[in-house]
Amino acid sequence: MTLKTLFLSLGLFAIAACVPKRDLPPDQISKLTKLDEVMDVQATIADPQFKKIGEASYADADWAAFTDLGSRIQVTAAKAKDFSKGPEFDKLADQLGGKAKELSAAATAKDSGAASTALTEMKATCKECHSKFK
């Protein structure tokens, strides 16, 4: 390994280490004190699942992850309203929570189409909220 490669690797590692990762269970989410913390939890748990949008079928591990995501996003969506930026923000938080509930139902039924749709709609809701309030 050359010195240049070593420094590049260390630099990339340092950048990756600076990105907040919060993998909190629902009972800990309710204790968060900043909207940024809530958003970090959502990104940490949702982004890996969003990559599965459109897949024709899912494995048992995916269904478990979708169930977990659905329950935790319902909590983060409710918690986000504690830091409300107005009625439109609250509406989007409620919408996200509703889509998370749909994801949980799809996971219970092991309905691939409904799960993919719920994930797509959750991601779209996140993007809409970020475009208006971030």
Question: Which residues does each predicted region cover?
Answer:
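Residue-centric detector for conserved, function-critical "anchor" positions
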Residues: L12
